[in-house]
Every structure is written in structure tokens, then in C-alpha cells.
Design a protein with these regions (language model features):
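Short, non-transmembrane alpha-helical segments in secretory-pathway proteins
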Residues: 1-28
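Detector for Asparagine
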Residues: 11-14, 41, 61, 77
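Functionally constrained cores in energy, signaling, and assembly domains
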Residues: 13-16, 57, 71
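Amphipathic alpha-helical interaction segments
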Residues: 20-21, 42-43, 68, 80
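Amphipathic, interaction-prone secondary-structure segments
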Residues: 29-66
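A short, surface-exposed interaction/processing loop segment used at functional sites
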Residues: 64-82
Length: 82
């Protein structure tokens, strides 16, 4: 399941991302930040060490045997003190 999520993200980079900006991305370039499986469904949050700031959410619907990819770009990271 996690390998499938990595493959989906790597394929997105290689098919959709700007080919001038990023060289070929493999599953080894993608890491899982968080993963959860409930019954036949699962969700994974993934990223890479690439400087583009992309973050991904892959959701798998086991009833429909379909995966969905959401791609996000980090806009800002600010410190908030207590």
C-alpha cells in the first residue's frame, strides 16, 4: 500500500510536473510522512526532499478500487510561540 502510494507520487512528478525543473523521480525519492488503513481503505501523506515544497495525499477507496491524489505546495512556514 505504501509502495503503491510512492509509485503514484513518482508517476505524478514524471507525468505532470515541469520536466525542465525536475529530473526523473523514482519511488526511492518519495517518503511516507503518515499512513492509516481502515478496513479496505487507506490514506498516505507523502513528500520528497526536492526543493519544490510539494506535499501529497493519496487516498484509496477499496470499495471502488480507486486511488485519488491531492497535490499541495507549501506556501509558508512560520514559527508560532506559546
Amino acid at each position: 500500500m505504501q509502495e503503491k502510494a510512492k509509485q503514484i507520487v513518482a508517476n505524478w512528478y514524471n507525468d505532470e510536473a515541469g520536466k525542465d525543473e525536475i529530473s526523473a523521480v523514482t519511488e526511492e525519492d518519495v517518503y511516507v510522512v503518515w499512513f492509516c488503513k481502515t478496513l479496505q481503505n487507506w490514506k498516505a501523506l507523502l513528500s520528497t526532499d526536492l526543493p519544490d515544497g510539494m506535499y501529497f495525499e493519496v487516498t484509496y477507496n477499496g470499495d471502488k478500487k480507486e486511488a485519488y491524489l491531492d497535490a499541495y505546495r507549501k506556501i509558508k512556514n512560520v514559527k508560532i510561540s506559546d
